[in-house]
Design a protein with these regions (language model features):
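Compact soluble domain cores
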Residues: 2-91
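Extended aliphatic helical segments
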Residues: 37-38, 76, 106, 125-127
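General "foldedness" signal
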Residues: 40, 78, 105, 138-140
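Enriched for short, Lys/Arg-rich terminal
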Residues: 107-109, 113-141
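Functional cores of ribonucleases/endoribonucleases
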Residues: 69-121
Length: 141
């Protein structure tokens, strides 16, 4: 199954309340265990980040549940043609993490794709979960 990519639009026309509502749904999916962090071959950066900071499932959940509306940056269209109807939401969360015994504050780049299951429940794929590696602007800070 091949997928074609396309140029993604960038969206910043959100209100704080819209992002808060999105995060309410996102948190419910996390608490219900209906999420995954992408760790495949193309997501090496996610895997290295998780390994470098020894982030276990409990810590993943803590970080994800701690995302606030003012951590929101922007949304983009899914670049894969067959998922063109999906929007990915980008957040950047500052978190103190243990790097082999040294505590350091890290800006974590988090890209979220929330979709629905056939039964209508939200399911979340955290596409990106790694150290921020480029400048970013927050929408509400």
């Amino acid at each position: 199954m091949s997928s074609t990519t396309r140029k993604a639009g960038k969206y910043t026309d959100f209100t704080p309340d819209e992002i808060k509502e999105y995060l309410t749904r996102f948190r419910k999916a996390i608490l219900d265990g209906k999420y995954t962090i992408a760790k495949g071959r193309k997501r090496r950066e996610n895997m290295e980040f998780i390994e470098d900071y020894r982030i276990n499932t409990k810590k993943e959940r803590e970080i994800l549940l701690g995302i606030q509306y003012d951590d929101f940056c922007y949304a983009v269209d899914n670049q894969k043609e067959e998922f063109a109807h999906e929007k990915l939401y980008i957040f950047c969360k500052s978190q103190e993490l243990d790097y082999w015994g040294e505590l350091e504050t890290v800006d974590i780049y988090i890209k979220i794709n929330m979709t629905q299951t056939k039964s209508g429940d939200d399911y979340t794929v955290v596409v990106s979960f790694h150290r921020r590696n480029k400048p970013i602007k927050y929408l509400f800070k």
